[in-house]
Amino acid sequence: MDYKYAPKRIEKKWQEHWEREKLFEVSEIPGREKFYLLEMFPYPSGRIHMGHVRNYSIGDVVARFLRMRGYNVLHPMGWDAFGMPAENAAIKAKTHPARWTYENIAYMRSQLKQLGFSYDWSREFATCDVSYYRWEQLFFLKMYEKGLAYKRSAYVNWCGTCLTVLANEQVEGGACWRCDQPVVQKEMEQWFFKITDYVEELLDYTHRLPGWPERVLTMQQNWIGKSLGSKLLFPLASGDGSITVFTTRADTLFGATFMSLAPEHPLVEGLCRGNPQESEVLRFVQAAKQAKRNDREAELLEKEGVFTGSCCINPVTGAKMPIYVANFVVMEYGTGAVMAVPAHDQRDFEFARKYGLPVKVVIKPADAAAAPAAQELSAAFEDDGVLVDSGAYSGMASAEARTAITADLAGKGLGEQTVQYRLRDWGISRQRYWGAPIPIVYCDKCGTVPVPEKDLPVVLPTDVALLPNGASPLPAHAPFLNTDCPRCGGPARRETDTMDTFVESSWYFARFACARYDQGPLDLPKVKYWMPVDQYIGGIEHAVLHLLYSRFFVKVLRDMGALEVDEPFRNLLTQGMVIKDGAKMSKSKGNVVDPDDMIKAYGADTVRLFCLFASPPEKDLEWSDQGVEGSFRFLSRIWRLVSDNLDALRSAPRHNGGGALPEPLEALHRKTHQTIKKVTEDIRDRFHFNTAIAAIMELVNQIYQVVEGGSRAGNIWPVVKEAVEALILLVSPMAPHIAEEIWHELGHTRSVLLEPWPEWSGKALQAEEVMLVVQVNGRLRSRITVPSDATPEQMEAAALADSRVQEFIAGKPVRKVVVVPKKIINVVV
């Protein structure tokens, strides 16, 4: 065994051993407890970054730990390979996205293997593989049959930079989640998945996921946005129809003095047609549609609008209400129409003041003698209260009035109690090339026709010329576009939109259970064995994107009979970011640390250990070069501990726990079992790898103390061997290469991964005596040793009898003695 720790020499050796012996490949073993551990698979951007290293190191510790605990662990890896970034990068590099993607996959796979992650590579796939997305196309057809996939004209989020539509969940603060450029509203024909059919189940199950972070569940609940309220009809003054409004404040209806419509509302053009305001309204509508979405939803937005020239009727007062188009009303919420109650809604209040519209107070605070006059208001009163100036409902509390007013309007056919959701159907059409083709054709005679299952897959053509601006080449690619109608055999055109890449990531975890199955998308017996994922690990930024879509998709597949679970992920860990110099690592900030450089300098085990030790997994990790060097020094200490004493360790029998031991050895024996318990519980119960590693460091220190003072304790080596072997097994999930090498050098022939996880002895944990700190008036004055089973009264008596404590008491009366058993005693005089 070399004296010096040299990770380059040992790491490749053990990686090749693991691969040759296929130690990470698994199959279904009936009767053996399974554990499916999965980290969110990466987009093959070209190189892994430190965020990947941290994420995957966390998962690998758990996977290795559970294997050693006897679980049948599935730990797969693949590639989220479709999408705009690959297409844009390929255009820039003047190559094809497929070539760019698969070259990146090859390099990133080698990086992951260099880090020693215990993936079952036999299950690897990329979502751009035809063998994967062919089954996704089948799911689309099944959803189309059930009405869960449909096409309609809709105002959608359009990114002019990426030249494609975005789902609502992909708009962050009014900007594109990919390029951070403004998103505008554009009317287009789009394909949707009817996620709203599952809205109640999606919401209900957020209360049945105890292994998920509360923050993620709250984000999903807020995104679903369930509101109990009233749907009210406001007849148009012209008599030509009505405007439907959703409100949670029917109690304020008597104070509604005007109506606000979203610029995208379908009635706007008809309401202004032929009126003097028509051209002004249309200009306003066009400008509002081009505005940044986040600007329109901002609290500080300057409220603007235009009178349409039409009015509607307040259904309880009979008063005419002017109808405005307003920039702060959006179609995504409610019905795109807002009954404006300026006395009791701040946005309406600001709008009314600006345009000189009437303000009518109809709610007063419950503890107020009278309502304030409208002209006295400096802001809207938005709380519940008691109704005033509201006809027969005056004097009612808000909650009571909401029910009564809605019920009375329902009797007249002008209202009903209803539930409204913020969640909208998932728009999956993307006007880009690099994605899974939608299996639909259009025939002038037959209309929209699904591709027959026997004709799947619809293969994305590779012989295309990518356009410099990123627009899809498919509409101009005749061999793909032109086809025969499956119904009549006549000429037809293929759908040229591709599917949102989040469709691929909404079911990949199930495919990992049967990645090589070619008779269908999912092999039910295998999926039944492995699903659901027991532990999922990834970033919180996916809370209302990937995680919500995956939950929806699993419920759809369950109802198709393809799965037998209700939820995809039993437990979820959202790890923090890796930051440097106070900011998230990014090329633009110039603070990126390349994992390859770190591995070359320090080895994979050091990089892994630092990522695990520097911070709890749910917190951000601040990169520190000194911290990396410290991790390397620690592994070097373990190496030297064994290399310096290898012959003694090899030849010594292992301590079996029997017989009395001198105090230094008894303390080490006890420390060994305390460490086993601590590390086991920290990994199993809390994922607190940082405190587990700290406990291992303490054990190393204590082993060194015994070894360096060995002659005074007799034959130390059986107890030291017990401690060292436990140490190697405990550190192996974090630093597997060095653990394998040392384990082999100690004379073992099996891989560490195949060894059972060490068990602690309850007897060994019990010290025959414990040392207590004794304070007098809060200051350390002595230490005493008492039997481990001493009562608090016995501990107090021993402290007061101690000679050093008596010196500091010096005859003063003892006012109080505070005993913290097995830790500290404080004497107050």
Curated annotation (Swiss-Prot):
So what does this thing catalyse? tRNA(Leu) + L-leucine + ATP = L-leucyl-tRNA(Leu) + AMP + diphosphate
| One of the GO biological process terms | leucyl-tRNA aminoacylation
Q: Where in the cell is it found?
A: Cytoplasm
One Pfam match:
tRNA-synt_1
Q: What is its main location?
A: cytoplasm
Top EC group: ligase
Q: Which InterPro entries match?
A: aa-tRNA-synth_I_CS, aa-tRNA-synth_Ia, Leu-tRNA-ligase, Leu_tRNA-synth_edit, M/V/L/I-tRNA-synth_anticd-bd, Methionyl/Leucyl_tRNA_Synth, Rossmann-like_a/b/a_fold, tRNAsynth_Ia_anticodon-bd
- Cellular component terms, GO, for this chain's entry? cytosol
Location of the motif 'KMSKS' region: 584-588
* Keyword Nucleotide-binding in annotation: yes
The residues listed in the UniProt record as binding ATP, with positions renumbered to this chain, are 587
Keywords assigned by UniProt?
Answer: Aminoacyl-tRNA synthetase, ATP-binding, Cytoplasm, Ligase, Nucleotide-binding, Protein biosynthesis
UniProt motif 'HIGH' region: location: 42-52
User: What would be an example GO MF term here?
Assistant: ATP binding
Q: What is its EC number?
A: 6.1.1.4
Q: Which HAMAP family match?
A: Leu_tRNA_synth_B
NCBIfam families linked to this entry: leuS_bact (TIGR00396)
Family the UniProt entry places it in: Belongs to the class-I aminoacyl-tRNA synthetase family.
- This protein's name: Leucine--tRNA ligase
